[in-house]
Amino acid sequence: MASLKEVKTRINSVQSTRKITSAMKMVASAKLHKAQGAIENMLPYQRKLNKILTNFLSADLPVESPFCVERPVKRVAIVAFSSNSSLCGAFNANVLKMFLQTVGEYRELGQDNILIYPVGKKIEEAVKKLGFFPQGSYQKLADKPSYDEAAALAKLLMELFLEKNIDRVELIYHHFKSMGVQELLRERYLPIDLSAVQNDEERGGVVNDYIIEPSAAQLIADLIPQVLSQKIFTAALDSNASEHAARTLAMQIATDNANELIQELTKQYNKTRQQAITNELLDIVGGSMA
């Protein structure tokens, strides 16, 4: 059985850890509140913008967009979103798992034809360990999502796609649903996927309600870059909010575990102390009878 001093030292150590996890939980909770507000304000706009675009592109109009062109995939770009720091449960591990699965599907293209754009320190480090060369560092975008940085990344991807330097772009990120639920998504970014609206009863309905000037082609040309830039920004906001939610939950669980451990150690301390007192009394009684 451990001595009183050893048990007391363990109790103090766990109490110190509990203070840290509790403080980290409060910080993460505050950041989550801010990030949640940003994503909740942005999502309706992004979804509406995307719906307008898909309605235009899928309507019976004599318009074609180069961003919708399907071609054989010879070169692919993968944009994966993670966090810059750890202590957020399985958040980064899940991103890495899906990233490895995605890379595995394109392995036959050859490593030189798989371009990786890591948004976040953790996925960037993992990419380097796997032997890939990251196409830039976007840690700031993961920590504090900025529309300007997101738009710059989107512009780069669009240019590469138009120049046929890449044939497909995929996104891997967490979608924030609630404090306890963050859904890991893998989405095709380019070419634009219209399959989701093929069976939409309202397909093309929005277009018929508008007079398009100067032309549908010009409107789509102006709208697509905005939608694609907004998509990267929204994914960054989604990932950021999901990270803080995962960290808040992880620190809450760690704090609860610390409380349980302190209770168990306190019981052990009291039991050990009681046993020590009993032994001393027995020694005293035994000495007086000798």
Curated annotation (Swiss-Prot):
First and last residue of the signal peptide: none
GO function terms (MF aspect): ATP binding; proton-transporting ATP synthase activity, rotational mechanism
GO cellular component, alphabetical, reads:
plasma membrane; proton-transporting ATP synthase complex
* Major subcellular site: membrane
Alphabetical GO biological process terms = proton motive force-driven plasma membrane ATP synthesis
Tell me which InterPro entries the record gives. ATP_synth_F1_ATPase_gsu, ATP_synth_F1_gsu
Task: Give the UniProt keywords, A-Z.
Answer: ATP synthesis, Cell inner membrane, Cell membrane, CF(1), Hydrogen ion transport, Ion transport, Membrane, Transport
One Pfam family, short name please?
Answer: ATP-synt
This protein's source sits in the domain of life called Bacteria
Classify the protein's membrane topology as the record does: Peripheral membrane protein
Locations listed in the record = Cell inner membrane
Question: What function is annotated for this protein?
Answer: Produces ATP from ADP in the presence of a proton gradient across the membrane. The gamma chain is believed to be important in regulating ATPase activity and the flow of protons through the CF(0) complex.
Concerning HAMAP family, the annotation shows:
ATP_synth_gamma_bact
The family note in this entry says:
Belongs to the ATPase gamma chain family.
Q: How does it assemble?
A: F-type ATPases have 2 components, CF(1) - the catalytic core - and CF(0) - the membrane proton channel. CF(1) has five subunits: alpha(3), beta(3), gamma(1), delta(1), epsilon(1). CF(0) has three main subunits: a, b and c.
Annotated protein name in UniProt: ATP synthase gamma chain
Instruction: Name the species this protein comes from.
Output: Bacteroides fragilis (strain ATCC 25285 / DSM 2151 / CCUG 4856 / JCM 11019 / LMG 10263 / NCTC 9343 / Onslow / VPI 2553 / EN-2)
